């Protein structure tokens, strides 16, 4: 059992990251985490630990600024990926994962039941495809501040969607037969089959810009809430650990099927309330994820079970249930925020001094 990261060690990590980033870093190199006071309540402590785990995972990505930064770019890269910085992140990561993601995985594993993956698929797909509406969007439809809330939804979603499929790309590295090729075909769909303007993260950037938001990766990371961080980190725990290969399949099974309905609801919401907004990101997913679910079931789940027997089935189910849990927490958090603002007479709206550039150069 790994011991949790101490407050002293976490604050030392934060100081290391701040030193490497320097003052006023471009978003690509901003790795800020909040300092953790000795008397922090558990919710704040968990939030800051999730911030640190976010930075552990982001450290494995190639992220470059949209325009040349002040100073020497190569020197910036040397600092950002420096040995001391990477060593500190790599030392903290397994402890943070055990503390933050471990309990979520235990709950998902307990929900996996008898491990019959094909029976689970037969239940799951009709269940998700029968979802009639999104409670968050239903609440927005009746709220006069729907644009502000939707901007926050986009801001929070940018944690994953501005680097969409980069996490799952780590799940196709190696050699594991025909299912690997099927997963790669799903991946290259997300990357627009090499046509940059069709890459899903580029489509999402256009949606951000249409709402007047900065579209730089990591641009709003200091505003990510706890549910956003938990969702991001659970997904990256799945895909940044090769041990989780069958659990990753469970994520894809749930996510690709759930997106068929959720993205359709978002496309309809934008068409009704924000017809001027760029909605291609959502319309594209509502269509293509129908094919992705079929590919996951027929070209990944079934071949794995035929090859290895029922053993991987339980992990596939648990991966799907972990995904269900973190998706539900994220959605519930957005809905609770709407209700909290509605109950607060003096709520302030807008980003205020936290706003970045109106639009990052495309």
Each language-model region and where it sits:
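Non-heme di-metal
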Residues: 1-362
